[in-house]
From Swiss-Prot:
Family from the record: Belongs to the G-protein coupled receptor 1 family.
Localization (cell): Cell membrane
Disulfide bond sites: 154-239
Presence of keyword Lipid biosynthesis: no
PANTHER family noted in UniProt: ADRENERGIC RECEPTOR-RELATED G-PROTEIN COUPLED RECEPTOR (PTHR24248), DOPAMINE D2-LIKE RECEPTOR (PTHR24248:SF125)
Family matches, as CDD domains: 7tmA_amine_R-like (cd14967)
Gene3D superfamilies in alphabetical order: Rhodopsin 7-helix transmembrane proteins (1.20.1070.10)
Purpose of the protein: Receptor for octopamine. Octopamine (OA) is a neurotransmitter, neurohormone, and neuromodulator in invertebrates. This receptor induces a long lasting opening of voltage- independent chloride channels, a process which seems to involve protein phosphorylation but does not require either cAPK or PKC. The rank order of potency for agonists is p-synephrine > p-octopamine > xylometazoline > B-HT920 > norepinephrine = clonidine > epinephrine > p-tyramine > phenylephrine = oxymetazoline = mehoxamine = dopamine > serotonin > histamine.
Principal location class: membrane
InterPro entries associated with the record: GPCR_Rhodpsn (IPR000276), GPCR_Rhodpsn_7TM (IPR017452)
GO cellular component, one term: plasma membrane
Protein name: Octopamine receptor 2
Amino acid sequence: MMSFPIALFADVNQSFRANLVVSSYHHAITFPTVRGANFSTFFPRNFSVSADVWLCGANFSQEWQLMQPVCSTKYDSITIFITVAVVLTLITLWTILGNFFVLMALYRYGTLRTMSNCLIGNLAISDLLLAVTVLPISTVHDLLGYWVFGEFTCTLWLCMDVLYCTASIWGLCTVAFDRYLATVYPVWYHDQRSVRKAVGCIVFVWIFSIVISFAPFIGWQHMIPSFFSFNASIQRYQCILFTSSSYVLYSSMGSFVIPAILMAFMYVRIFVVLHNQSRGVKFKSGLKISSSKYNGCPVINEPSREGINGLGRDVTNTTLLSDAVGSSADLTSNGKDDPRVLATAPIELTEDVPPLNGHHHRTVHETPYVSGLHTKRSNSFALPTELEKKCKPLTNNILHMMDFDRRNSHNAVIQRSASEMVNLDVSKHELLISNVCHRSKSATALTSETGDPLGSLAGPRRSLQCNVGGLVRNKHMTLSMKRRFELREQRATKRMLLIMACFCVCWMPFLFMYILRSVCDTCHMNQHFVAAIIWLGYVNSSLNPVLYTLFNDDFKVAFKRLIGARSPSAYRSPGPRR
């Protein structure tokens, strides 16, 4: 037995020497005893008070009393005890501060209150409540190794734990669902998104979580008395996690398995869509510029469909024209300006149609391979703008289409400036052109439906006549756009993998342990191992503010402003982002 002298001050005039004794009985760390001081008035008589040590469990009353000698039955080293206490306290504080800053940013800056960010705010609420109400009690419970807060608190603590953890996991699922819709169905998402729908998702999360967490009071009332039970080996009461196999199966399916499967499916689908977008850009390198001219313009020849990386007739390549054009374009028909159309995305040219009046007429589709919806058998060229150069590409872009009547064809001119224009032979119908540069990752559509014929595309060969002042840069622009899409795909992929990896690492061990304890009564698990797995699940709530906000530039700016770090970028108001 080893003693550590500690000076304690009983009052202003007198100090006492004390010994902090590490007892070999139950390997317990006990509080110091002070010679000359009588503590028997503070504790019941059935507690043994010796001159040197309080034995953790000696003559212990089986009725819970707050004033019993508090000691740890879990650690036999003061160094390990303090280290664990510091780590658990830091996790709790970080979870509180991180999620508090997320909510403060949403409260202070109204421009952040988009549908996606409202779902992130709901996630922060569940994580914050978990950190405030559950984690402090869990810290004390895991440090001492037994329960000191009474039977009612035990039952309430277990239910609150399940409630907030379930709400947090389903909050992650709603965020994934929101991004899934925005990426895979951008047109529908742009039309249907609203704060009301976000509130509906939030209400569903909490109702479902309440049904899961408070089910013991409805269908499993017989197991409630087993939560708070006496452990004879340590002479202490314990608050035991659910062990009923039927309830464990019910809660694990609703709280972990189903949302995990949904999240995995949605993130894989998002990855596939982003990968297809990247492939779409990679394919746009096969058009060649011939030395011949048509009406004084260089001619862009299209490659054969069979010679493109074995893709057959599904997709063909594009050439990208000048990047020095303006940020918008006015569409003119019959010499009259029509400012209702803003062209900021690639336009794809599809199959030849039967010749009419000696010319080959063709249908034009605007399909920038950005929404996972791509048009087969298409050849395309792109007109990037300065606006597109400045903005970050994103996943929420819209597939739009221009259908034209072959019989009513006129000349249409997309006019960039006095010296930069592209003549297209197209015909009438409707034009839907997307804004591919919305920085908030939301889809913004500019729609124009006109009854005027838009012209027709003429030319005896598979070619495009243009007059862009010699600004055609096929190779360099294609490589630049290809690189941008590759980088965007890499960033999005890494972020999705990080989110799923953190979720699986944090919660899957708990899921296996949770199920194993219920089906195997004879399986003995080390108490330190069980506590580490439980806290690993709690850590996910401390990582969520990092994963879902610090990758968002607007949230980073808001955080800097909240803490007073006035960087130059922090002076602008955060804008909505998806």
